[in-house]
């Protein structure tokens, strides 16, 4: 049950990140592939340039704003033409029948037959852990959600505390301690 919930969190978070990427980078962003498991999510997308640190922060902020708003996540069935006419995003190369499932998570509306949480708040916090190139005009973003985000933050806190001890400072004035040692 814990593993399945983690997968549902990461799968729904993938849709929300796709929406956030399009809001920050532009409508040219299209999904090129993804991987979802209980540990993380990976999302490949079309984009012509590296995503800056500021853009990544805005993407995270938008995604987490949507998760924290605790919007209902709905899955409905309709004809493919009706879904597309209402603005649902379909993925190039995917084969769809005449009837499709439409996933709605706030402003994110996509064709998807996968498993999801029932409200965006069930995802928890989404944290982007990497972004990079995987080919010409193709980027990859990796992220975690839910308890994996908590685990990551706790791990980061331990590393910060260890480095602070090494440089003789507290975690809150770590940069000062590092600058003294450099």
State where each predicted segment sits.
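Ordered, soluble secondary-structure elements with a strong preference for glycine-centered loop motifs
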Residues: 6-12, 49-57, 150-154, 168, ...
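Generic, well-ordered alpha-helical scaffold segments in large soluble proteins
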Residues: 16-24, 58-69, 108, 144, ...
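Terminal appendage regions of diverse proteins
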Residues: 28, 122-182
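Non-catalytic interaction/regulatory segments
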Residues: 45-134
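A generic structural motif
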Residues: 2-4, 47-51, 132, 145-149
């Amino acid at each position: 049950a814990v593993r399945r919930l983690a997968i549902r969190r990461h799968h729904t978070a993938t849709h929300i990140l796709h929406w956030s990427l399009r809001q920050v980078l532009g409508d040219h962003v299209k999904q090129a592939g993804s991987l979802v498991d209980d540990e993380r999510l990976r999302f490949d997308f079309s984009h012509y340039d590296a995503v800056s640190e500021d853009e990544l922060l805005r993407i995270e902020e938008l995604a987490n704003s949507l998760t924290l708003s605790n919007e209902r996540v709905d899955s409905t069935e309709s004809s493919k033409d009706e879904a597309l006419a209402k603005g649902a995003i379909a993925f190039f190369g995917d084969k769809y029948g005449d009837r499709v499932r439409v996933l709605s998570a706030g402003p994110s509306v996509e064709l998807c037959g996968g498993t999801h949480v029932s409200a965006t708040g069930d995802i928890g916090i989404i944290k982007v852990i990497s972004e990079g190139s995987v080919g010409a005009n193709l980027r990859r973003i990796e992220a975690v959600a839910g308890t994996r985000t908590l685990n990551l933050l706790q791990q980061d806190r331990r590393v910060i505390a260890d480095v602070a001890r090494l440089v003789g400072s507290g975690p809150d004035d770590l940069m000062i301690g590092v600058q003294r040692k450099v």
